[in-house]
Amino acid sequence: MTTFNEYPFLAELGIKAENNDGVFNGKWGGAGEIIKCLNPTNNKVIATVRGAAPEEYETCIQAMLAAKVKWALTPAPRRGEIVRLIGQAMREKIEPLSKLISLEMGKIYIEAKGEVQEFIDVCDYATGLSRSINGQVMPSERPNHILMETWNPLGLVGIITAFNFPCAVLGWNAAISMICGNVQLWKGASTTSLITLAVSKIIEKVLVENDVDPAVCCVLIGPGRTVGEQMIQDKRFGLISFTGSTEVGRRISSTVHGYFGKTILELGGNNAIVVAEDADIELVLRAVLFASVGTTGQRCTTCRRLFVHESLYDTILERLTKAYKTIKIGNPLEEGVLVGPLHTQSAVKEFTEGLEEIKKQGGKVVIGGNKLDISGGNFVEPTVVAIEHDAPIVKTELFVPILYIMKFKNLDDAFAWNNEVPQGLSSSLFTNNQKNIFKWLGPTGSDCGIVNVNVATNGAEIGGAFGGEKETGGGRESGSDSWKQYCRRSTNTINYGNTMPLSQGINFN
């Protein structure tokens, strides 16, 4: 039994109840296995998609190769205008698209709407960037010479995105990659196939209406073991951008770097908030609540570790427990709900098995810890656990709403505990002490790619570069100078004189 007819907004997005095409190479098709798209609120089928057959991969590549040169030669401001129009088209569909994200992914509606807005914001940012991407011009030591650099497209870019941000992460990558002059192949998570379809149809319409080869943005829906494997093995890609687990990212890294290809890897996070003794408790509580339970603990930047100074520990724990008791759990499309379901039943298993291991390692559940029986969906209670900082499980990432709380005496210890895990994505310090702030931001502070003060670990703005260090992968997406990763840099020396002087004063006469 399907739930398709309960959601009229699906038709607004061009989605059918059965056999939606899952391959786009300028034209829609799909000859592979049928994918059942589930609603995590009740685990009923929403609709079905026919995924890609292995042989359809090459049709996408050939279509991209055919579109590559013309798109690369299109002036960057014109490419930026196309991206602006994509953002505008997304803006016009923000309501039904946000509802679809809530329905298929499981995050609450207001967060889903924020995700679509993030895609729109990146398009706006990329549009402006299309008129300002540039290389440096540097003084030459030789007379009548110019030393400069140019940035050219990589050609083919592969974008593999995860279930938790099935719309925004495409925007981070595709909007920037497009203004840089690349053509892209997108493989979204199989469990969010309808979102992949809806976004792709919006992009396709803009490209066609503006006489751009729609193969500039191709799509393959299918499992990673087939579609993803074909992509990472293909040396024709100038870049593979992957968002997902550290385990899969490690394999992608070894494969792509094995043939000296380029990657952007956004992998696991094990993010911490450090609460100093002078912290503003009200700020702490608001930040921790959103950071730990937002998106049901399924953000890369979710706060998983909370280090609290001993003088504030009891107060923070008591008030945080009270706040957790007020959280409304349920259908993410219902107003007032703060926590929706986990995305899959396997995530529920990760939650229950993770708690068993936590207890074996001395952890004590302060609040939560239960699987919930709500409408047959993947619901669990957001959970707070008291545990030692060096318990082995604390160094792994459980992608569920479990928050570890730990007490410290010395701020230097808390800084060290923040850094002792293999991951290095996001971190935040709550303090009003200027010395501690700049120590936290400096070489002996946090070793993460995102280092905040008095804000949550999650909810990053698009203007900054997003990414982390260590086993988080080292890649950067979205803002700042992340655009450089989607380009090929060349250093140029131009002689406009009549002599041939050599650098470093060499005389080779």
From Swiss-Prot:
The active site is at 266 (proton acceptor), 300 (nucleophile). It comes from the Eukaryota. The keyword NAD applies. PROSITE patterns: ALDEHYDE_DEHYDR_GLU (PS00687). One of its GO terms (cellular component) is phagocytic vesicle. The record marks 164 as: Transition state stabilizer. Disulfide bonds: none annotated. Its EC number is 1.2.1.3. GO terms for molecular function: aldehyde dehydrogenase (NAD+) activity. SUPFAM superfamilies: ALDH-like (SSF53720). Belongs to the aldehyde dehydrogenase family. Homotetramer. This is Putative aldehyde dehydrogenase family 7 member A1 homolog. It comes from Dictyostelium discoideum.
